[in-house]
């Protein structure tokens, strides 16, 4: 990794290693001026944003090659810090030389703050069951139950949007009015108080018996009248 950074009195820090185990990193410093600067390799737990003077700073100037060795344990991180009384640009190049391999596997970009803290990696997607089928789901989703509830809410909202229209309410009001009319006006007794009798002709009354049962031509027949 190679990076040119403006170094001032507030330290800028680089993560040397954040993987558990021993490490060896070569740091090449190439300042743009002959002004002195300071460097230190230490653990992150000893490097804070309020007090830097208690760190074992090394004073130097010009080009410099530093080999930083250490062992990462307990989740701590090793950092390489730079500061300069007179602000200057310094090119920083780092190589991970663990096991003789030259790479920048453990090296991270510098920070704009007192020390660099890379963001944590995003959690992997969880595997949930959707109606018996396994599939990858988003982190904020809790699975099939949440998805089903969301669908029900969407369907209910669509139904309410359809029902909540003036023409629909007009139709519902007309239907309710018709049912009330049928129940209270078409089924109530007429002319006999509360006796329960309805205003419908009875078929076996003497007044209507002959004329109702047979046509008028039969009632005028003498044989029919005599037989009655």
Curated annotation (Swiss-Prot):
Q: Which residues cross the membrane?
A: 167-186
Q: What is its main location?
A: membrane
| Keyword Magnesium belongs to the record | no
**Where do the segments described as Disordered lie?**
106-125
- Residues with glycosylation annotation: 48, 58, 140
The reply to whether Transferase figures as a keyword in the UniProt entry is: no
Gene Ontology cellular component annotations, sorted alphabetically: membrane
UniProt keyword terms in alphabetical order: Glycoprotein, Membrane, Transmembrane, Transmembrane helix
Where does this one sit in the cell? Membrane
Regarding the membrane, this protein is recorded as:
Single-pass membrane protein
Q: Which family does it belong to?
A: Belongs to the ascovirus HvAv ORF58 family.
What protein name is recorded for this chain?
Uncharacterized protein ORF43
Q: Which organism is it from?
A: Spodoptera frugiperda ascovirus 1a
Traced from the root, the source organism's taxonomic lineage reads:
Viruses, Varidnaviria, Bamfordvirae, Nucleocytoviricota, Megaviricetes
């Amino acid at each position: 990794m190679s990076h040119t950074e403006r170094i001032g009195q507030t330290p800028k820090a680089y993560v040397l290693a954040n993987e558990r185990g021993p490490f060896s990193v070569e740091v090449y410093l190439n300042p743009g001026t002959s002004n002195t600067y300071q460097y230190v390799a230490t653990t992150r737990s000893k490097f804070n944003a309020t007090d830097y003077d208690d760190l074992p700073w090394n004073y130097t100037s010009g080009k410099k090659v530093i080999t930083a060795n250490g062992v990462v344990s307990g989740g701590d991180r090793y950092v390489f810090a730079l500061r300069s009384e007179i602000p200057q640009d310094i090119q920083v190049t780092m190589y991970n030389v663990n096991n003789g391999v030259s790479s920048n596997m453990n090296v991270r970009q510098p920070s704009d703050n007192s020390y660099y803290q890379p963001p944590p990696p995003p959690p992997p997607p969880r595997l949930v069951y959707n109606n018996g089928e396994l599939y990858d789901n988003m982190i904020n989703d809790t699975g099939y139950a949440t998805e089903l509830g969301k669908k029900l809410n969407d369907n209910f909202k669509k139904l309410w949007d359809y029902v909540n229209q003036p023409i629909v309410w007009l139709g519902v009001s007309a239907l309710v009015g018709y049912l009330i009319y049928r129940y209270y006006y078409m089924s109530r007794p007429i002319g006999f108080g509360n006796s329960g009798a309805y205003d419908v002709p009875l078929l076996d009354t003497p007044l209507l018996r002959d004329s109702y049962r047979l046509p008028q031509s039969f009632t005028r027949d003498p044989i029919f009248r005599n037989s009655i």
